[in-house]
């Protein structure tokens, strides 16, 4: 059998600017927001809405997404850590073990928190524009949100996070996530004696001395790529429903399609 499985040890940093690391994950968010604005503009202009209303929606959505996703990760998933590092919730820094602070950027974001944040923000948005109903807004913003979800999952893949279940070495699509949950940064640096995580993982992959360590890392489903493909398909379904059918006039219909499909992924 021909297999496509491979070892994934990506450099999550796209480039550095003035000492600040720009990560692929952050880049994917920029792409998602930019494309989302463009797609929503087509929808808004099609329905006679103004650019002012569009720009306002973009601001509400962007802030709600980032704040909601950040708080969701900190409060729902990593509160044991952040309750002792409250400043790190709001600032892109991390406390060094030996004292002091390191500028790291925000790395923890949760889609559940983003979803809650966006819905709450839409309540504020429709209070500003009395001619809009919540159902109308939600039915339309989930379309660009869906394609945005695809790019966010690409970012998760670059970060080696949200990995899938373990598969056999012969599974055609298996991926060995070297920087995933099976080999912590601390353990990799301890084994190799490297001074940085990047160097430690490089040694694990390329130095024959650590071949047994590399072999012990299991292949896993690339769940991020599966979900990215699913979001891509769902986007075209919702796009078709909006532009080619009259279902867009049925309150919460498109939003409901989005929820049903997305909920099945979140629970899988």
What is the predicted function of each stretch?
Residues 1-268:
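A feature for loop-to-transmembrane-helix boundaries and adjacent hydrophobic helices
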């Amino acid at each position: 059998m021909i297999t496509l499985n491979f070892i994934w040890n990506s450099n999550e940093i796209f480039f550095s600017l003035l000492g600040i690391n720009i990560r692929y994950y952050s880049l994917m968010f920029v792409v998602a927001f930019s494309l989302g604005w463009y797609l929503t503009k087509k929808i808004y202009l099609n329905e006679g809405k103004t650019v002012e209303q569009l720009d306002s929606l973009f601001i509400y959505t962007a802030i709600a997404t980032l704040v909601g996703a950040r708080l969701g990760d900190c409060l729902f998933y990593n509160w044991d850590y952040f309750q002792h590092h409250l400043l790190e919730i709001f600032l892109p820094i991390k406390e060094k073990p030996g004292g002091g602070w390191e500028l790291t950027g925000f790395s923890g974001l949760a889609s559940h928190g983003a979803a809650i944040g966006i819905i709450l923000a839409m309540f504020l948005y429709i209070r500003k524009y009395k001619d809009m109903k919540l159902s109308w807004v939600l039915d339309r913003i989930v379309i660009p949100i869906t394609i945005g979800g695809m790019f966010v999952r690409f970012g998760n893949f670059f970060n080696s996070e949200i990995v899938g279940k373990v598969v056999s070495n012969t599974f055609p699509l298996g991926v060995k996530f070297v920087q995933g949950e099976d080999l912590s940064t601390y353990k990799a640096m301890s084994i190799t004696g490297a001074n940085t995580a990047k160097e430690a993982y490089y040694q694990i992959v390329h130095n024959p001395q650590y071949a047994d360590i590399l072999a012990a890392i299991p292949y896993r489903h690339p769940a991020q790529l599966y979900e990215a493909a699913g979001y891509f398909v769902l986007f075209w379904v919702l796009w078709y429903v909006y532009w080619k059918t009259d279902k867009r006039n049925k309150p919460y219909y498109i939003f409901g399609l989005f929820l049903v499909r997305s909920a099945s992924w979140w629970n899988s």
